[in-house]
Amino acid sequence: MTRAFYIGRFQPYHFGHHTIIKQIAEEVDELVVGIGSAQKSHESTDPFTAGERVLMVYNALENLPIRHYVLPIEDIKYNSIWVHHVASRTPHFEVVYSNNPLVIQLFREAGVCVKQSPLYIRERYSGTEIRRRMIAGEKWEHLVPKSVVEVIKEIDGVTRLRNVSASDNNSSL
């Protein structure tokens, strides 16, 4: 049995992530999805809480044909021990899927097999672009699974994003 790890901020979870996860699911038996930067929320680049993102991902993966876990992973100050931090918060996994150069470097240094995940129309399916559309009042719903739209509407996430993006003096209290 092979269990994989895939991490993202998922601000918000979109069809780019969804396509990658479906491809990973064809190669492994189980998948651990890490909600990265779990401590961040209510910021223009990170508007959603870890709990909201867990719900987005969990609901979107409801029909994934393999067992999967969705777990929050907080950032830490020391990159050199980050892999151990992740390992202490997740079930054991044999392979990591990532395109993030730092994530790749840290897991390779720790002796973990790393596979690069294919990017899926990144210029269209990116959290940055989706958040930009939300702020601008443009259509964004077609870029994310329906279940993600439902979570964002339930929490009035677009209004939150617009409010926290209105000032550059809101990064911390």
Swiss-Prot record:
Where does this protein act, in terms of pathway? Cofactor biosynthesis; NAD(+) biosynthesis; NAD(+) from nicotinamide D-ribonucleotide: step 1/1
Looking up Pfam families in the UniProt record yields: CTP_transf_like
| Entry-linked HAMAP family | NMN_adenylyltr
Give the CC-aspect GO terms: cytoplasm
Question: What taxonomic ancestry is recorded?
Answer: Archaea, Methanobacteriati, Methanobacteriota, Stenosarchaea group, Methanomicrobia
Q: What is its EC number?
A: 2.7.7.1
Annotated keywords: ATP-binding, Cytoplasm, NAD, Nucleotide-binding, Nucleotidyltransferase, Pyridine nucleotide biosynthesis, Transferase
* UniProt subcellular location: Cytoplasm
- Annotated catalysed reactions: beta-nicotinamide D-ribonucleotide + ATP + H(+) = diphosphate + NAD(+)
In terms of superkingdom, the source organism counts as Archaea
What protein am I looking at? Nicotinamide-nucleotide adenylyltransferase
